[in-house]
Amino acid sequence: MGLENATKLMNYISKSGKEYICLLQMHCNVDQKELKEIISQFVGEIYQKPPVRSSVKRRIRKRRIYAIDILDMQDKLILLRVQSDAGTYMRKLCHDVGVIAGCGSHMRELRRIRSGIFTEKTNMVTLQEVSESLYLYRNCKDESELRRILLPMEYGVCGIPKVIVSDTAVNAITYGAKLNLPGILAYQNFRKNQDVAVLTLKGELVAIGESIVESKQLESGKKGEVIRPKRIFMERDIYPKSWK
């Protein structure tokens, strides 16, 4: 959930890797050794066609599953932990496991425990917690819970390569100007055409842009355009203009 300018970050966060706890219902008895062999076939690059009931076009999509762990087994119920790319359909994965097993299967329950850097154990909260913290603030003037669950939007770019820019470069970027090499003070490695977060010396998020060159080319010291802004987060004219 994003508020105000932070809503612009949601698209980037939604594309990050996911981790799920999934309850799989087999339609026949399968021993653990056989199930492990079946599941191992789905680790790596897979091809999926979205289920009939989905919000996207039903075309073949390539996704990557990084790991599938069996947490528990009771009769025909299998508890799984799955780490995957964004956009991987767990419902379809459960169905396909049953197809390979030769008896069918379906997903009974699903819980997302990680989205990018946001995890259930650290900084993910339920809508109920949001509602309760807002109630405390409005009715008891207690903002402690709101402060606990509200994170600065800079937190949302932890998984994106970053560049630190000089104060004189900030305002031009907020007007949509491309970032040139002289304005960069520090950077993390990035590839060409990769999303890069642009931050001030104070760590404030200015923009997210697409790299025009790879970071290795910056070592040459040659002047030129480095980042093309895609999403601007900072308001204009907070930092002084470097032009007249």
Tell me what each language-model feature is.
Residues G2-T7, K192-V196:
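N-terminal, positively charged regions that mediate nucleic acid binding
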Residues L3-E129, I149:
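Non-catalytic RNA-recognition surface used by pseudouridine synthases
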Residues S55-I60, L77, I100-K244:
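Accessory RNA 3′-end/elbow-binding domains used by RNA modification enzymes
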